């Protein structure tokens, strides 16, 4: 077979592509140059073109964890690599390879349909599979890092494809090696390691309350419970623009936690690493009176103070202005700094 027949289909290039439907805040934004990536083989040629033109670049997946400006200059790579397959299986676990552009919730559904439990606590988290490890998404007591075997990516520093084992990913709370080195890696595939000996993880308060009378729920029951809780607490981005949790839960030393607890007996917190506690950012924001408040076209969600929303017509500048007000008030009231979770592009 000749080389022309083996050559990958060229990436589709669109100029001034509207991105309002590709970011969950629903901001009216556009990409100066947008490259649609449907296979890993397209990336070297695209990156060569970007380098030749000396363009800035970034990857955009589901747009669920980003704050977009009016115009994204340079090149935007739209991650649309699909596919999911079980690559190996033994008595202990199954390895599942998933394309970076696959919708995260769709993959969770696929895993349960294929009798591969483990990810049910992460149901309904918006975004793509490729973005999940970058942020190390987590919810209801687990993180995606708990189930990752390795990650395949294009390294823009070496112009080559690499496979990073879990140990090289430096996963931490909402953090990873990929997040620490922005504009370097383009995640094309994530390999998950899902255990055959599944155990329910329902110690998180909201889930524990759901199963007070059922100590041994099945994966599907946990999946449905998580969906129910998230639907009740979090707004649907298709109805009202948002990026889910806007601030990370701050982690403080035990000494600072004890001081805060003395002043605020109802302080909500959770155990973290030895000698540290994780504070509930939503509770801090609520105590400062922001829950349900509106500032122009943006505001704080009425059912969850951790979520900032775009009521329509809002901009990145608007949402960041509101975020700054919240950060300043929380710092003044509690002496705690809140870190923004979405990436500001």
UniProtKB/Swiss-Prot annotation:
NCBIfam families: murB (TIGR00179), PRK00046.1 (NF000755). The active site is at residues 174, 245, 341. PANTHER family: UDP-N-ACETYLENOLPYRUVOYLGLUCOSAMINE REDUCTASE (PTHR21071:SF4). Its cofactor is FAD. GO terms for cellular component: cytosol. It is found in: Cytoplasm. The gene is murB. GO terms for biological process: cell division; cell wall organization; peptidoglycan biosynthetic process; regulation of cell shape. It holds the Pfam family FAD_binding_4. Belongs to the MurB family. It is an enzyme of class 1 (oxidoreductase). Residues 27-197 form the FAD-binding PCMH-type domain. It comes from Polynucleobacter asymbioticus (strain DSM 18221 / CIP 109841 / QLW-P1DMWA-1) (Polynucleobacter necessarius subsp. asymbioticus). This is UDP-N-acetylenolpyruvoylglucosamine reductase. The lineage of its organism: Bacteria, Pseudomonadati, Pseudomonadota, Betaproteobacteria, Burkholderiales. Cell wall formation. The keyword Signal does not apply. Its EC number is 1.3.1.98. One of its GO terms (molecular function) is UDP-N-acetylmuramate dehydrogenase activity. Pathway: Cell wall biogenesis; peptidoglycan biosynthesis.
């Amino acid at each position: 077979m000749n080389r022309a027949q083996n050559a990958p289909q060229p990436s589709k290039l669109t100029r001034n592509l509207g991105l309002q439907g590709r970011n969950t805040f629903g901001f009216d934004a556009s990409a100066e140059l947008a490259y649609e990536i449907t296979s890993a083989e397209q990336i070297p040629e695209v990156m060569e073109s970007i380098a030749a033109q000396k363009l800035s670049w970034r990857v955009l997946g589901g747009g669920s964890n980003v704050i977009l400006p009016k115009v994204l200059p340079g090149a935007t790579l739209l991650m649309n690599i699909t596919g999911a397959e079980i690559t190996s299986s033994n008595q202990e676990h199954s390895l599942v390879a998933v394309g970076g552009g696959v919708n995260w919730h769709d993959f969770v559904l696929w895993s349960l349909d294929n009798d591969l439990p483990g990810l049910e606590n992460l149901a309904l988290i918006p975004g793509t599979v490729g973005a999940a490890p970058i942020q190390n998404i987590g919810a209801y007591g687990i993180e995606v890092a708990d189930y990752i075997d390795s990650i395949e990516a294009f390294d823009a520093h070496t112009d080559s494809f690499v496979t990073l084992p879990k140990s090289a990913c430096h996963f931490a709370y909402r953090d990873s090696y990929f997040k620490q080195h922005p504009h370097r890696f383009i995640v094309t595939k994530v390999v998950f390691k899902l255990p055959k000996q599944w155990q329910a993880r329902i110690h998180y308060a909201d889930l524990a309350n759901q199963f007070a009378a059922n100590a041994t729920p099945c994966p599907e029951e946990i999946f449905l419970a998580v969906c129910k809780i998230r639907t009740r607490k979090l707004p649907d981005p298709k109805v009202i623009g948002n990026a889910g949790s806007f601030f990370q839960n701050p982690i403080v030393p035990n000494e600072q936690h004890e001081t805060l607890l003395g002043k605020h007996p109802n302080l909500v917190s959770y155990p973290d690493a030895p000698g540290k506690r994780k504070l509930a950012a939503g509770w801090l924001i609520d105590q400062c009176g922001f829950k349900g408040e509106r500032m122009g076209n943006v505001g704080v969600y009425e059912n969850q103070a951790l979520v900032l929303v775009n009521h329509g017509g809002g901009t990145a500048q608007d949402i960041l202005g509101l975020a700054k007000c919240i950060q300043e008030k929380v710092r003044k009231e509690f002496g705690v700094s809140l870190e923004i979770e979405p990436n500001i592009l």
